């Protein structure tokens, strides 16, 4: 019996995680992740490149060709199209085939990765390819203390990834690579606790955020994430909508070097060509990229919660075009609103931004209240959604989603209380498709629904000191049992009379027993 795609996927996931655990030995999974993820990426680009060269011609097997038959023209054309070049001898399948007997495996892998990256030098793809394998350190002691140990561990990784049933490239199973990669990242994040949440947004939450940002748009120029992590949020937009809807591609910035490389690999693994994505490394708040590429029609983000930033210690920031309109900077101890104002500045007139936020920023005073006033007075706040707790890796906090828009048709602010919409699954809660659909329905209609959603007039928000806390406007359902006092008194009366009767019965029995004893 043929397995269904769901069964195939479940089996693949089981196999991947088993391999990931088998090959790491005593090394912590979190520290070893770049080797498994890197090997998966290496296999992907090798098969992707071979498929491009063969172009559907069954008479050609690129992996069996000799490197010497490759002309400069073939190489030049390939790099212009794919962004990189891999010689037949450098392909994953050829390296993996000899891995167990290659006593120079770690050196050979390093040379191959350097060659792949350097093949893009001087081409438009150079920045997208450069440093992709930087975290795949073939000399690291995490692999073992001796060269022999290192090679054995590397061979185990390659052989493990080689054995994954990821389908033929020509069988439209390309998404299996991306799916396998996302599954691995998700599992590493779940097992890493707090640090895992910093680079991966769970797919169910990503789905909601992508739908909020893209709602009602038949096409967007490009989509942007100012705190991109591993790219999972950006890619969710690709999964939710046809490719042609996002015309110019995917843009993001990430501060952590390892995570930045994961994000770029993730783009390739989801078959996004180098000219359709641009992920930059750096601090979004103090060294923002893409000033020339803005505005963006869709912005999605799950920035770090309440991190410290330089804020008022940098006198130039209050005059920065992103922060100046609000007249105040986000507190140095809580950068949340700095990310919000950055996103707003990068948003187009027809666009939407959906940003995951720490709930405190919606009710605290001081600078944060002034920023809320700026956002509300200028009618940028479309919706605030409170989510259930424990939806994210590394935190049990019940976070909010802030939806910003520059094309609202009224001055109301919508509040949605989705804190009861969740399903318990292992250690975390999840949003089901039905939950997401329910949230999107009320978001789209803007109708008031008891205990779920309320559209609040601008004047009411102002009168409430610009408090944007969902609980201030959506009345929570009272789950306490309603007690009927009259009914309770009647039951009490009946119970008391029963007790009185029982006492009389007991007294009679006692008297009878005592009478019998006297007669004796």
From Swiss-Prot:
It catalyses: a 2'-deoxyadenosine in DNA + S-adenosyl-L-methionine = an N(6)-methyl-2'-deoxyadenosine in DNA + S-adenosyl-L-homocysteine + H(+). S-adenosyl-L-methionine binds at residues 198-203, 230-232, 254. It comes from Escherichia coli. Gene3D superfamilies: 1.20.1260.30, Vaccinia Virus protein VP39. It is an enzyme of class 2 (transferase). The C-terminus is required for assembly of the restriction enzyme complex. The individual domains assume different positions in the enzyme, allowing the holoenzyme to regulate the methylase, endonuclease and translocation states. NCBIfam families: hsdM. Signal peptide: none annotated. Type I restriction and modification enzymes are complex, multifunctional systems which require ATP, S-adenosyl methionine and Mg(2+) as cofactors and, in addition to their endonucleolytic and methylase activities, are potent DNA-dependent ATPases. Residues 10-190 are annotated as: N-terminal domain. Belongs to the N(4)/N(6)-methyltransferase family. One of its GO terms (biological process) is methylation. PANTHER family: SITE-SPECIFIC DNA-METHYLTRANSFERASE (ADENINE-SPECIFIC) (PTHR42933:SF1), SLR6095 PROTEIN (PTHR42933). GO terms for molecular function: DNA binding; N-methyltransferase activity; site-specific DNA-methyltransferase (adenine-specific) activity. This is Type I restriction enzyme EcoR124I/EcoR124II methylase subunit. Keywords: DNA-binding, Methyltransferase, Plasmid, Restriction system, S-adenosyl-L-methionine, Transferase. The subtype gamma methyltransferase (M) subunit of a type I restriction enzyme. In the presence of the R subunit the complex can also act as an endonuclease, binding to the same target sequence but cutting the DNA some distance from this site. Whether the DNA is cut or modified depends on the methylation state of the target sequence. When the target site is unmodified, the DNA is cut. The keyword S-adenosyl-L-methionine applies. The type I restriction/modification system is composed of three polypeptides R, M and S; the restriction enzyme has stoichiometry R(2)M(2)S(1) while the methyltransferase is M(2)S(1). There is an equilibrium between R(2)M(2)S(1) and R(1)M(2)S(1); the latter is methylation and translocation proficient but restriction deficient. (Microbial infection) Holoenenzyme interacts with Escherichia phage T7 protein Ocr; this interaction leads to the inhibition of the restriction activity, but may still allow methylation and translocation. Its EC number is 2.1.1.72. Residues 198-473 are annotated as: Catalytic domain. Residues 481-510 are annotated as: C-terminal tail. InterPro entries: D12N6_MeTrfase_N, DNA_Adenine_Mtase, DNA_methylase_A-5, DNA_methylase_N6_adenine_CS, Restrct_endonuc_T1M, SAM-dependent_MTases_sf, T1MK-like_N_sf.
